[in-house]
Amino acid sequence: MPSIISDPQAYDIMLRLLQFSCWSLSYINTVRTTLSDQLPSVSFMSICCDVAWEFVYAFVYPIASSHWAGGIRIWFAMHCVMLFIVAKYAPNDWDHVPLMKRFARLAYVAITIGFMAGHLALASEIGPALGFFWSGALCQITASLGSLCLLVCRGSTRGASIKTCPLCWFYIAITLTLDAIYPVFFFYFRAIEHPKKDSERKVE
């Protein structure tokens, strides 16, 4: 009986289930931390970009996310709950900007619609399949950059749960480990594929 790793399809499904589980747990933890600190634990741009992306590829271009077997729709539902809770406490994050404090909830809606238009425009420009990937990459960048910006701008760990959440440490450890391993294997296989070219370059 072939192992999961030797079966590409089974391996792919296993990785998707792992990713789905980790992101879902991350969303649940975000809600828990927001309710606990009464302060958004996810960046403004990040959640708006995510909700917009999930709406576009769950309902407008579902075929582009069909390989997730409905997972995007589940994430969209979870994100809507998260957005409602985050928006509820959003004014607490804007005491230094009275105008934003007053219209924070409206801003969440407006920015989400703006990102939605952007995702749709990109999909129409390069196609839903590529749009799904590149828009998803943008979501990942805003999530990583947004979390850092929140921490630096606030100068406080309120709203952030890295110290108290073992799952966060696991996520950081596994992603950094995999990112560190990737270039090692990349250059290893590159050396095997192009030994002659590499040796010629060294001679030159």
Swiss-Prot record:
Protein name in the entry: Terpene cyclase trt1
What is the uppermost EC class here? lyase
Q: Name one GO cellular component term.
A: membrane
Supply the alphabetized keyword list: Lyase, Membrane, Transmembrane, Transmembrane helix
Localization, per the record, is: Membrane
| Membrane topology of this protein | Multi-pass membrane protein
Question: What is this protein's gene name?
Answer: trt1
Task: Give the Pfam families listed for this entry.
Answer: Pyr4-TMTC (PF25129)
Provenance organism: Aspergillus terreus (strain NIH 2624 / FGSC A1156)
Biological or metabolic pathway of the protein: Secondary metabolite biosynthesis; terpenoid biosynthesis
